[in-house]
């Protein structure tokens, strides 16, 4: 057990350190190659590197691989969880990078996470029997792998990409989600426990990335980062049988989806900045960020902290309902 705990600790440290090193390197590379975007929520509209998500991918892969190496012979069945999530994350990371570089159309981009579901299907992660409130347990059989699993991963990845645009918002939301899933998983056994460990690694990586991404951001995650985080969160939830938790954790994104759908997904999440640095939105809200802007006078980091607070409340509900009340 001691060796296993040391392996977990080493994996978390490796993930965190590699994220710091690789993100700093990517920032320099993006500045040299011109991979930057305007920070439109600032008065100065500075150019900010947009491929910071590469650091997230590198840190997560390094941390997960370290955990796999240090725990493979000690934990039967760990390969299915870690390897499937690792392969899935590499696929979505690569596709996200292509999107950032070549600007893939929105319609095509929406279906990219389906490819990331292939390793999860091949390793048969998840459980075909799902407990549904008021209906009881339902065995979806093969439909789980050909419909439910790919659909879940597609939804979690695309939804996560919708609510972004403010410094640190997405990475912080991902950190909260990862900590909630880690708590649930580590309280459980078997596959859920392994998924919880992977979630701890993701949390350490996102914490490291936030050092560069929180206000004022030195880099943006890009589509590679947002799709990656959403996809990994979905993979962890699926492999750890934490479907109820995923439902509650993604409720803010359900709100975001409804608001964006009203604009036919052409809406934005950023606001209009005044000369004092406060963000405003006077039109009909097409993002959760706009709702916050309309209820008070806030600067960018205030809005981020408020939405983080909302996500923390849903994370608490996720933990309670997943571990105490029901299991979907």
UniProtKB/Swiss-Prot annotation:
Q: Which family does it belong to?
A: Belongs to the glycosyltransferase 4 family.
Single Gene Ontology BP annotation: cell wall organization
Q: Which CDD domains match?
A: GT_GPT_archaea
Location in the cell reads:
Cell membrane
- Could you tell me which Pfam families the record lists for this protein? Glycos_transf_4
Cellular component terms, GO, for this chain's entry?
plasma membrane
Q: Which UniProt keywords apply?
A: Cell membrane, Glycosyltransferase, Membrane, Transferase, Transmembrane, Transmembrane helix
Matching entries from PANTHER family are given as: PHOSPHO-N-ACETYLMURAMOYL-PENTAPEPTIDE-TRANSFERASE (PTHR22926), UNDECAPRENYL-PHOSPHATE ALPHA-N-ACETYLGLUCOSAMINYL 1-PHOSPHATE TRANSFERASE (PTHR22926:SF3)
EC number(s) from the headed UniProt entry = 2.7.8.15
Q: Which domain of life is it from?
A: Archaea
Q: Name one GO molecular function term.
A: glycosyltransferase activity
- Name of the protein in its database record: Putative UDP-N-acetylglucosamine--dolichyl-phosphate N-acetylglucosaminephosphotransferase
Taxonomy of the source species? Archaea, Thermoproteota, Thermoprotei, Sulfolobales, Sulfolobaceae
Where is it mostly found? membrane
Q: Characterize the regulation of its activity.
A: Inhibited by tunicamycin.
Against InterPro entries, the record matches this protein to: Glycosyl_transferase_4
Chain segments annotated as coiled-coil in the UniProt record = none
